[in-house]
Structures are given as structure tokens and as C-alpha cells.
A protein has these predicted regions:
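Polysaccharide-binding surfaces and accessory modules of carbohydrate-active proteins
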Residues: 1-181, 185, 192-196, 615-627
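Active-site and adjacent substrate-binding regions of carbohydrate-active enzymes
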Residues: 86-88, 308, 321-325, 375-456, ...
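Short solvent-exposed strand-capping/beta-turn motif centered on an Asx-Ser/Thr pair
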Residues: 89-94, 279, 594-598, 609
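Short Pro-Gly-centered flexible turn/kink motifs
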Residues: 198-217, 642-650
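Active-site-proximal substrate-binding groove within the catalytic cores of carbohydrate-active enzymes
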Residues: 208, 402, 428-627, 635-648
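Terminal connector regions
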Residues: 214-247
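Flexible loop/turn segments at secondary-structure boundaries
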Residues: 215-220, 256-264, 292-298, 337-342, ...
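Aromatic-lined carbohydrate-binding/catalytic grooves of carbohydrate-active enzymes
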Residues: 243-382, 393-395
Length: 653
């Protein structure tokens, strides 16, 4: 799409810490009992054009004879955006003095009537994905609760002031902190690693979170769509250099009656693929989740990273080769950071494990693999890389199903607070970077009991195909989740599960997908829960709805997003949204009437519609109409029975 960035947007760069000089950098830290701001002379400044739209300034200086500070500031020329990251390195032969309270950004965002718009992220409960708007009239602290980056506080938030706003994102796959408080002239913001108070050992480097700011003139909706455009341009990973297209996923869940994927065999995977192909359903992704390794049908028994030869005597290669021959990408699940007793890693390398004692005095059954140990990280890189290559894996999926916070805290020294966490984060990112570099075309799916670790540093390398473990088939909960994802992390996946009962309430029993379940799962990627041996009628429905989904998903990735309703997680509401490409004058809107909605008529008032006449086509292609722009803007009404949905595609006639 053509740029919508204006001179008014770019004039706001000075409000988001545009680079001026080393001593005016917004970094703050305390070292040896003294507080410092910026980088003091003497220092070196290097300016590098990363591409036509990005310039990076690297500022290096010495704090004393042993501690070096390097700050990287990136400015974007195609958006009013800045980015900050810093590294501290001990260049000496002895431990440094104490370094603490490091804040990569600590400064003032000028503006009147500031308000903070923020969320609680993925809590792994139904109360997750909530949003709040608070006037900045007292100090507020945002920080996740368990050592993952999105549980209890979402690392994407916004400050709105009079006539403009700033989108802010924290890139730290662990415990970050952001403090926002009122100050003369605006809002003071301070962002860093939540726990950082340590000496650095000789040769050691510690880094800060990476923080991004994107400023915009106008209202929140404009700020949201500028963020989406920036994300698609600069963050979303590409597939072989091309934008990631919609992905349709299939699998054999609970194969052989065993939980998750503990029952997969070479035979049932290949026959499952053939069943779908013979029915006319060709997936983009063939999904193998937890349980393909030796685990005695207990998938959390993790730590032996090799295929279970009892079920997969020739490894994963026959399945991967089958996928390659059919033009399908094989996705494979890993959880490398968790280790259980009795597994290969626990027996061979106990020195790589961080253990913790629970509050009741017993040992946690989960040990944390210390990716901050370079030898450990190298071993995991080599082992997983070999599985990827041997298995023809095209999508690497990583999960993380427990909290690491206490594992770090219980194993750190008094003068090394936050060090294990910091080194682990560095190892985690190095691990992913190595896998991607070694396997051209590989892309990554990020998961942590759903969406607990989807900070921006992670999202530079991955997409969240599984953004939550909550509410797959509870449609109002899913609508609330999608509302946040479309705004901040706009490539994600949904299931077409349905858990609703005949009376419109929701339980946990999953029912066969129907048309409504497909409409409730409109997202850039879809996992179709239609079974590989489903009857012809179910396969026919899947084929029909897949085409509607794919057309809509393409527009989601090529248009601005406009929510047309509030989203309250209520089965009594309408849910509606619009995606619009202003360059082509085309898009679609969807209206969904939830299971207990007493209203029958919804009036859709479309956004961003230029003057002219528009041709509208129903998703199923059975209905068409021609409508002028004035009517679309003022509202066009549709009658829907409860538990139904419509999609209308439109284009300028």
C-alpha cells in the first residue's frame, strides 16, 4: 500500500528521542554507586545506512577502564519510528563494579492530557487479552508476572496525548518493566529489564531490552494502522524473501487415541495426508505437535530430542519427504527449555539444568535448560538443526510451558541479580538466529503456553501461530483475542473449534466444525479441525469455507483494520470488522451474531471509503449489490439470525 505517513507524523520524531548527541541519549544506569545518563565523552559514533529507509547510529564509550557501553539507535525514514538497544561489556580482567537499574529509555514524551492504553496480555485464563485506558495522573508500572514477556502485562502499549500518540513495544523475552508517570510537559517513561543488579565477569556482555517507538498524528485508529503497516514492512518474518501468505493447517490430533501427537506413526501421518488430498483438501502446513520423541505417551516428558524409533523407525524423513513431494510444509514442535528427569539431557548434562524448589519444599519436576551456557546452547543448536535437516522441517515451532522466573532467582548469586535471565535471553535469541541461518527458508512459530512470549524481539524472528491456550472454541473470548492480535501482532492463526451448547452457552466439549465455526475463525492462518476421515459432507463444507477464508485472509494482510463493534467477550453481542486497502478501494467486512444475541439487525458503517460506487459480493458468491460510498459510510443494514455470520467483499466499481 502507498504510504500514509505525513509531515505531521515525521515532525513528531523529536518527541520519541530522535538521536541528537551521545550525552542526550535516553539511557539511564547506575554504576559503582553513581547515576549516569547518555554516553559520556570520549566516545565513538558510527552512522550506518541499513537500507533505503533505516539508519543506525552506534555510540560506544567507556564508563571506566573495564566497562564498555554500546548503544544502538535506529531511525526509520518511512515511518516516524525510533529504536533503542544497548550492550554493556566487561573488557577487563576482573569483575566490574555493581551495575544496576539499567533503563534503555528513561525520558519525557511531551504532550498534553496523556493517557496510557495497555493490556494484560495472555494470562492463560479467560481474563486475558483485556485492555485498559488510564489517565497518566499517577505512576503506573507494567511488568509481567512470571518471567515470560506477555503474562500479566502486554509489551505493546500506547500513549495518547492531545492530537497525537506514540505506539511503544518492548523486545525482551523475559521480565521487562515500564514505568509511566506524570511529569511537567507530558509523561515520563522508563523501560528496562525488571531485575538488573550485578557485576559483570571478564569478557561478559549484558544487553538491554530493545524498545521501539512509533509516533503518529491523529487518533488511535490511525495510530493502529500505521503500526500494522510498520509491522508488515519491518517486523513480520518473510518466507524466502516474500511476504508470508495465509497458511491453511491440517493434522491428525490424538492419533491412535493417544494424547496430543504421542500416537503418530510414519504410516498414520502419510495416510492422513493422503486422506485429505484425496478429499480435495491440500494443506499449506502439516502440523506435528508435542509427542513425536520418546515419552511413553506422556508428552511433557521432555528432554530427549530425537524421534521415537518405536513409532518412527526411519525418523521424520519419510513424513517430511511426503510433504515436500506434495508442496506441503512440515511443522514440528519443540520445547527445548524444559527438561524432565530421566531424559537424555537430564542424564548426560545435569550441569546445564537450573532447578528450583517449590513453596512446599518439593523439587519442581521441570528443570530449565540454561541457554545462557554457551556449550549448552551450541549443543541444542546442533541437535535441533540435525532434526530439522533430516526431517525436512520447514516450520520450526517452539513452546514454553512453565515459568522460568524462580529457576533464575533461586540459582543466582547476590551480586548477579538478573544475570542468568539476561544470558538466557541472549542464548534464546542466538539459538533461533542460528537455526534460521542454517536452514534457508525456515520460519519460526512462537508459542509459550499460547501467547506468553510474543514480545517484539521474538516477533522479529517468528509468528505466533498459537497465540493462546484459552478459548479455542469459545467464540466471544476468541473475538476479544483477535481484536488485540489484529491491532498489534497481525499475523496469527485460529482454530475452527466450537464449544457452544444448544442453549448458546459455552462448555469445553468440542463439536464438529460447522459454517459458523469457520466464520468465527477468520484469521491470517487457520487450522481446520475437520478430521482426515470425516464424511463427504464435512469435507465439502471445509473446501467451500476454505476458499472464503483464504480470500478474506489475503485482505487481512493487505489492508488497514477497522473494528466496527466493541468487543466484550459476550455471547449476546454482534462482532464486526472491516479490512480496507485504500490503494485499490477494495476490502471486506464481516458481521457475526453471537449465540445469544437478541438483536437481529446490524448496521455496518464502513470506514475510509472514498467517494464512488462499490460492487459488493457475499462471501459465498450467491448475492451481489452495488452501493454508493455515501450509503456505505452512513450505514448499510443486515438482518442476521443468532449464531450466524456474513462476509461481504467489496471493490470500487
Amino acid at each position: 500500500m502507498k504510504s500514509i505517513v505525513t509531515s505531521a507524523d515525521m515532525a513528531l520524531m523529536n518527541r520519541i528521542f530522535r538521536y541528537d548527541s551521545p550525552e542526550k541519549l535516553p539511557i539511564y544506569y547506575e554504576y559503582g554507586g553513581h547515576a549516569y545518563r547518555g554516553v559520556q565523552e570520549p566516545c565513538r559514533v558510527c552512522r550506518e545506512a541499513l537500507d533505503a529507509n533505516m539508519v543506525r547510529y552506534t555510540v560506544c564509550g567507556r564508563i571506566d577502564e573495564s566497562l564498555e557501553l554500546r548503544v544502538e539507535i535506529t531511525e526509520y525514514g518511512d515511518f516516524a519510528a525510533t529504536e533503542f538497544l544497548a550492550f554493556f561489556t566487561n573488557c577487563g580482567n576482573a569483575e566490574t563494579k555493581r551495575l544496576r537499574n539499567v533503563r534503555i529509555v528513561d525520558g519525557l514524551i511531551e504532550g498534553e492530557d496523556a493517557a496510557l492504553i495497555h493490556g494484560n496480555g495472555d494470562t492463560c485464563r479467560e481474563d486475558g487479552y483485556e485492555w485498559f485506558r488510564d489517565a497518566v495522573d499517577e505512576k503506573m508500572t507494567l511488568t509481567p508476572v512470571d518471567g515470560t514477556s506477555c503474562n500479566g502485562a502486554f509489551p505493546y502499549f500506547r500513549i495518547m496525548a492531545k492530537n497525537f500518540g506514540v505506539n511503544i513495544a518492548v523486545g525482551w523475552p523475559a521480565a521487562w518493566i515500564a514505568e509511566i508517570e506524570p511529569a511537567t510537559g507530558g509523561a515520563h517513561i522508563s523501560i528496562g529489564q525488571a531485575r538488573f543488579d550485578m557485576v559483570l565477569r571478564p569478557g561478559e556482555t549484558m544487553r538491554t531490552p530493545r524498545v521501539n517507538f512509533l509516533a503518529f498524528a491523529g487518533d488511535e485508529t490511525r495510530g493502529m494502522n500505521l503500526w500494522r503497516r510498520w509491522y508488515f514492512s519491518h517486523i513480520l518474518p518473510r518466507e524466502n524473501g516474500k511476504p508470508l501468505p495465509p497458511k491453511y493447517c491440517l493434522h491428525t490430533f490424538n492419533a491412535g487415541g493417544h494424547p496430543e501427537f504421542t500416537g503418530i506413526t510414519t504410516e498414520n501421518q502419510i495416510s492422513g495426508i493422503d486422506d485429505y488430498l484425496n478429499a480435495g483438501l491440500r494443506p499449506d502446513i502439516w502440523w506435528i505437535d508435542a509427542g513425536w520423541y520418546p515419552c511413553d505417551y506422556d508428552w511433557p516428558k521432555i528432554g530427549t530430542w530425537k524421534p521415537d524409533t518405536a513409532r518412527l523407525p526411519n525418523g521424520l524423513a519419510p513424513i517430511g519427504e511426503k510433504c515436500d513431494s506434495e508442496g506441503i510444509q512440515l511443522l514440528l514442535w519443540f520445547e527445548p527449555e524444559r527438561v524432565r528427569e530421566g531424559t537424555e539431557l537430564a542424564i548426560a548434562h545435569p550441569e546445564w539444568l537450573l532447578r528450583r524448589t517449590k513453596a512446599d519444599g518439593t523439587r519442581d519436576e521441570n528443570s530449565l535448560l540454561n541457554l545462557g551456557d554457551r556449550a549448552c546452547c551450541d549443543w541444542v543448536i546442533d541437535r535441533v538443526d540435525s532434526i530439522i535437516k533430516e526431517g525436512h522441517v520447514r516450520v520450526y515451532r517452539q513452546d514454553f510451558n512453565f515459568s522460568p522466573r524462580e529457576h533464575w532467582i533461586q540459582n543466582e548469586a547476590e551480586n548477579r541479580i538478573g544475570a542468568l535471565e539476561n544470558l538466557h535471553v541472549q542464548g534464546y535469541l542466538r539459538y533461533w538466529d542460528a537455526l534460521i541461518a542454517r536452514n534457508p527458508g525456515l520460519w519460526v512459530d512462537s508459542c509459550a503456553s499460547g501467547g506468553r512470549r510474543n514480545d517484539l524481539e521474538t516477533m522479529r524472528r517468528a509468528v505466533p501461530l498459537h497465540y493462546t491456550d484459552v478459548g479455542y472454541g469459545n467464540h466471544p473470548i476468541k473475538q476479544k483475542q483477535h481484536r488485540e492480535m489484529f491491532e498489534w501482532i497481525p499475523y496469527f492463526r485460529a482454530h475452527n473449534m466450537r464449544w457452544d451448547n444448544p442453549d448458546g452457552s459455552y462448555g469445553r466439549e468440542n463439536h464438529t466444525p460447522d459454517e459458523f465455526a469457520y466464520y468465527a475463525a477468520m484469521a491470517p492462518s487457520l487450522t481446520d479441525m475437520t478430521e482426515h476421515d470425516a464424511p463427504k459432507e464435512a469435507m465439502a463444507l471445509a473446501i467451500r469455507m476454505r476458499e472464503i477464508w483464504r480470500k478474506a485472509a489475503g485482505r487481512m494482510l493487505d489492508g488497514d483494520y477497522y473494528p466496527l463493534t466493541e468487543c466484550r467477550k459476550s455471547n449476546e453481542d454482534f462482532y464486526a470488522m472491516q479490512f480496507h486497502n485504500p490503494d485499490t478501494g477494495s476490502g471486506f467486512f464481516q458481521i457475526l451474531s453471537n449465540t445469544c444475541n437478541r438483536k437481529r439487525v446490524f448496521t455496518a458503517k464502513l470506514r475510509a471509503i472514498d467517494d464512488g460506487v462499490y460492487a459488493l459480493t457475499a462471501g459465498d458468491g450467491k448475492s451481489r449489490m452495488v452501493v454508493d460510498a455515501k450509503r456505505l459510510r452512513e450505514g448499510i443494514s443486515f438482518e442476521l439470525p443468532r449464531r450466524s455470520s456474513v462476509i461481504w467483499f467489496y471493490e470500487k466499481a
